[in-house]
Amino acid sequence: MNKEERAKRQSKIRNFSIIAHIDHGKSTLADRILEKTNALTQREMKAQLLDSMDLERERGITIKLNAVQLNYKAKDGEEYILHLIDTPGHVDFTYEVSRSLAACEGAILVVDAAQGIEAQTLANVYLALDNNLEILPVINKIDLPSADPERVRQEVEDVIGLDASEAVLASAKAGIGIEEILEQIVEKVPAPAGDSEEPLQCMIFDSLYDPYRGVIAYIRVVNGTVKVGDKVRMMATGKEFEVTEVGVFTPKTTQRDELTVGDVGFLAASIKNVGDTRVGDTITHAKRPAAEPLAGYRKLNPMVFCGLYPIDSARYNDLRDALEKLELNDSALEFEPETSQALGFGFRCGFLGLLHMEIIQERIEREFKIDLITTAPSVIYKVYLTNGEDVIVDNPSNMPDPQSIDRVEEPFVKASIMVPNDYVGAVMEICQGKRGTFIDMQYLDETRVTLTYEIPLSEIVYDFFDQLKSNTKGYASFDYELIGYKPSKLVKMDILLNNEQVDALSFIVHRDSAYDRGKVIVEKLKELIPRQQFEVPIQATIGNKVVARSTIKAMRKNVLAKCYGGDISRKRKLLDKQKESKKRMKSVGSVEVPQEAFMAVLKMDDN
């Protein structure tokens, strides 16, 4: 293409994404848009088409972002090229959303006509506003009996401050209002800025590993043009490659000769090493590089850590490969090797949140067929020692000796919880139980309230979300952001089995709840660990002080079975002999800890 053709094509491109709270109908709307623009034949169409991972379909949530190029003939008779970038709605995957938004000029904000605005809706809108996107509100599910589009329209204006007078009333399920949405995209979303003659700048917003073609980078071209055969350079790592193919997703991968300004597509360049394409990096030409890289994304720091160990220790290297491949298209995952006396060799992994942790675990078990043991999740603590040094602890077993600790600080989050009036009491009770500090309470309208609390991250990590949902019948929605570290009275609790410490069961707990926690865990382990031939004491200790103890009674053989009647001294002799053997056994015996026991420590608050 020459310069004029490229400029004309550029003026017809519209890049947009769809943002919404979980379950407000984002993926269904994406399906309808694909149908409307005839991107697929009826035969290829299936529900939640862009959720390509089995896991996404099963849980009905979007985890990864996805990009598609569509052609749309508008009412003004012109052909437009639309790039739809689908985004997840769950709080753990906010980084996926911020990556999608950085590649767009506009966003469709989907709000459920019955539920109204929820916490994640707001969080994602603020992300979109930070990226200066044109936001088009769409009120979805208007065919529900409980829908109240006018109230929701008012809410969008009051809470977010967007003009909702032209908001499209739609039902993605019934296919109502889809054309109006497409027309609004064409009219209101600006065409991409940028110059096809400038030095090349492409932003990598995702990547995948293909065993035959190497690493495939998903890119958005900001300036310049990239063709097959070009020599390109990754600006963060400085590595150079020759482009072997470029193309777009129509959801299938379709090869093209070149990608130019505003295009969203993929680029392969026989990149073998997973670490060479970092998400957020800029690709430029090796001969005529751009002066500076694009502003990427903030690198998201993991907030929750846990140990992953293969049940079969021979599969340690397979687990490393699995984690490396997942890290490639999940830039927020971090891991490093660690060893545990109880569990052998494994990895300490960092995640954004509990859902993220569960999903990664499940993907490893499914896609790579590796059975895992996971240890209790923990957060990063800052420990200040009496000698003036400070250390960072992400694994309870690395906690320094209590005598040498001056103070411990833990991360706090600011949690905003949107909840119907009737459940305010229940939510406040949960937050107080989790050591939360009340900050603020605002009424959105007559029926809904936003509560703001400061809560330690370690309390949210366990099962805060589950408790919140179950005590509000699923109506509460929740969003959190890290606000920093504050000192807390924290202690490390160790579990001793048969007087030996099991490092994988250690955890860090607030001093006030240490006794209760210890008591519950000891009782729980007593139920889960099978009886042995000798008696096994289970102790919960803080430093050298035992705070809770329970004993698993020994199984014993009836050694008197052969003595009919018989002399008491004969019986005594047999019983004493048995006692001696048990004692000897106890000093050399070791106790196997079943996988359920590790899980029990996580699911502490069930009772």
Swiss-Prot record:
PROSITE patterns: G_TR_1, G_TR_2. One of its GO terms (biological process) is positive regulation of translation. The keyword rRNA-binding does not apply. One of its GO terms (cellular component) is plasma membrane. It is an enzyme of class 3 (hydrolase). It catalyses: GTP + H2O = GDP + phosphate + H(+). Keywords: Cell membrane, GTP-binding, Hydrolase, Membrane, Nucleotide-binding, Protein biosynthesis. Its EC number is 3.6.5.n1. GTP binds at D23, H24, G25, K26, S27, T28, N140, K141, I142, D143. It is a peripheral membrane protein. It is found in: Cell membrane. Residues 11-193 form the tr-type G domain. One of its GO terms (molecular function) is GTP binding. The keyword Ion transport does not apply. Belongs to the TRAFAC class translation factor GTPase superfamily. Classic translation factor GTPase family. LepA subfamily. Required for accurate and efficient protein synthesis under certain stress conditions. May act as a fidelity factor of the translation reaction, by catalyzing a one-codon backward translocation of tRNAs on improperly translocated ribosomes. Back-translocation proceeds from a post-translocation (POST) complex to a pre-translocation (PRE) complex, thus giving elongation factor G a second chance to translocate the tRNAs correctly. Binds to ribosomes in a GTP-dependent manner. This is Elongation factor 4. The gene is lepA.
